[in-house]
Amino acid sequence: MENEYRLRFFEEEGLKRKRCKVCGSYFWTKGEHEVCGDSPCQEYEFFDVPTKVKLSLRDAKREFIKFFEEKGHVPVEPRPVVARWRDDLFLTIASIVVFQPHVTKGLVPPPANPLVIVQPCIRLEDIDNVGLTLGRHMTGFHMGGHHAFNYPDNWVYWKEETVKLAYEFFTERIGIPEELLNFKESWWEGGGNAGPSFEVTVAGLELATLVFMQYDVVEENGQKKYVPMKLKVVDTGYGIERIAWFTQKTPTAFHAVYGELLHEFHKRLGVEEPPDELLYELVRSAGLMDPERPETLERVYKRASEKLGMRVDEIREIHSRASLVYQVLDHTRTLMWMLADGIVPSNVGEGYLARLVIRRTLRALKKLKADVPLSELLELQINYWKDDYPRAWKNKDYILDVVEFEQKKFEETLKKGRNIVIRLIKKKKQITLDDLVELYDSHGIPPDIVSEIAKEMGVRVEVPHNFYSIVASRHQKTVHKVKGAEEKGKLPPEIIEWAKGFPPTRRLFHEDPYMKEFDAQVIGSNRNYVILDKTAFYPEGGGQAADTGVIASGDESYRVVDVQKVGDVIVHVLDRDYSGGKVVVGRIDWERRYRLMRHHTGTHLLLGALRKVLGDHVWQAGAEKTPEKARFDFTHHKPLTREEVRKIEEVANKVIDERRKIRAFTLPRNEAEARYWFSIYQGGVPMSKDIRLVEIEGWDVEACFGTHLSNTGEVGSLKIISTRKIQDGVVRVEFVAGTRVAEEAAKMEDLIREASEKLSTNPEMLVKRIDALQKELENVKKTVAEYRKRLVSEYLKAAKALDGIKYVKLDLRDPELVQEVLRALSSDSPAAVIVDGRVELAAPKGVDVGKAVREVVREVGCKGGGKGNRATVVCESEEKVVELLSKLAAKLTSQPSGRRG
């Protein structure tokens, strides 16, 4: 392995290979020191290291880009923090994620080669350490990356050049003395790839990692195997926040990153800023702090106490409160990024991670007893960073609204949560880590709240320091794919395998979506499955139903009942086995197809209207287009109001009236993303070099496989027929378009007319008639309640007792009356209410009527059961009822806790 790290550059520059006397890792340096320069092997001593420049975060980003641009790299715009192009990640955790898997797998060329990018990233694995380690850990950070993609026929650069670039950047541009720079040997694995790497460290602080991605990691017979990649990738990650901190030498990284905003947060949260000398003393040992081992913190406090003459408990309190301020500062910027890029907090996916950050921030505010709305702090962040993150400024209204909504929701959760925790403790007598995770996942109850409630009940709960990291790690990854016929199971496995052997089918439905009839050659048939050289039949996909119609060969006609896509091959499913010739005529069921086209184009129109009315956070979560109607699921934090529905319809129909042009065209993926951004990927991200786009002029552009109209006027009109929240953070809209609007209107007219006739009024007076009936009903309810009250009193007077069980027979089948009588009768002893052989039983708490019933019911010849102090039994005769009550009385008397009146 040593050869992987022995470079000509090191020899030429005089760097020697050493072994760290603390951790045993090998590193390369010009210096005489014996440690690798990383923490915890070395404390943070970079405060004493001189530099040429003093860089703000903005300056550090600019200098990084400028340096590598001068070295021949093309700057690339940063991508969203939501990794919607990945099917295994929710968040962008590194700059290389931007190019995985489409570029790193060789499917798509990079946007430039070599390139440089400063990418906002979010990692939640160490969320519990944020604040406590004074800037060593952050949930949100900028990763500077210079990347080179080395193809067999286009080699760019590799280890020698990468290390030289890093060396020059840190020594020449930043001005770090050469003898203090270390290149620590390491090994990197992630995302199915691996390779050797160097960690660039200086005086305790890691400033960059240089990864040489050269292996695919595969598993064979349970053994990990490294297979050389054809495409070798230079994957570097420079900590831009750390570079800013390194050059500014501020007491914490938060001071370097947030500047005046840090002071404002201290003021708003009512927390006095710690003295700089204390922070400097604590931060030097930040690399030694392991919050999962409290004794490491205590050692740091004790040392600071001895040096500064302060009490340990005083230092602990100051550090704890300042840490919470830094945590809130970090989390609110991370939230700003998440929400600005369209995440809607929910209980699944990336929405779950956003909610986790929100709720952890709210708990920090609670611990500080800070009476400050979270939205107020988000607004400070948005205003402070508006020039750096214009998407946050643009989506400010949504960000503040959703945060206020989430804060209210969390407060309601805490009110309900107490009883949930109490019930669980009574049932289990203890709370495990799995219980804590379940309580948080399913009910949103934070672990510290659980611990407080448990303590009141005399139960001790161990809450791991890294609880939120554990929870986040369970929700960091996903698998969401646009399914083809292979995954949908619409075709038998043997047909899928058979279809893979044919060349791609020419797509006439894309060349001319209005083609109703076509000639084609049969190039394969297998039972009732047929493959043509070209087809106008649209295969199911993108939420659009498959076409149906007829395939004719000579005098024979076959119904096309389904069409599926296997890769680039289109399979036609017929109503019977095919026995025709090689030449066929295909005829589309045009009326059905045209309705599908109207609904598909209508869906694109609707999405544009939703984003216009509700905001850019609206993102497709699912869609289905059928001839009858279309369904569109989208991300949004609240159910739609009637006013919003009307506005959405109005906006969509205005675009229909404007008869805007619609065109479908193909662009190279990189060009499509650069021109239209990532909102084109509403229905998933195709892993292809070229992207087919559908554009509604001046309104909407999406990557889409479906068939569309030529202008919006052909949609006719659009009417939303239903909206509902289908899950946390997802709203479903169903709508109809074209002639279906008139059909739906006729259906509603019939319903209104029928209702009017039944209520003996005309449609215009229907609402008034219903209002009048509601008032009548309320009066009737009041009258019934009064009579019921009198009846309860009468029945209580008529009650009898049988061996300690009170009972009464009712001659009215009124469930509410039965329950009211039973409640009153069983307040101090077991009781029964009998209605037509049905016996409802109840008793005071502590009396197990259910158990007694289960023991005697068969013996008596009745049927029934119960649980706790309630039961229901059905008997065929009055004699059996009497026998039942008598035997129950005996059983209840023998119960240890049985009570009788």
UniProtKB/Swiss-Prot annotation:
InterPro entries: aa-tRNA-synth_II/BPL/LPL, Ala-tRNA-lgiase_IIc, Ala-tRNA-ligase_IIc_anticod-bd, Ala-tRNA-synth_IIc_core, Ala-tRNA-synth_IIc_N, Ala-tRNA_lgiase_arc, Ala-tRNA_ligase, Thr/Ala-tRNA-synth_IIc_edit. It catalyses: tRNA(Ala) + L-alanine + ATP = L-alanyl-tRNA(Ala) + AMP + diphosphate. Belongs to the class-II aminoacyl-tRNA synthetase family. It is found in: Cytoplasm. It comes from Ignicoccus hospitalis (strain KIN4/I / DSM 18386 / JCM 14125). Binds 1 zinc ion per subunit. Consists of three domains; the N-terminal catalytic domain, the editing domain and the C-terminal C-Ala domain. The editing domain removes incorrectly charged amino acids, while the C-Ala domain, along with tRNA(Ala), serves as a bridge to cooperatively bring together the editing and aminoacylation centers thus stimulating deacylation of misacylated tRNAs. This is Alanine--tRNA ligase. HAMAP family: Ala_tRNA_synth_A.
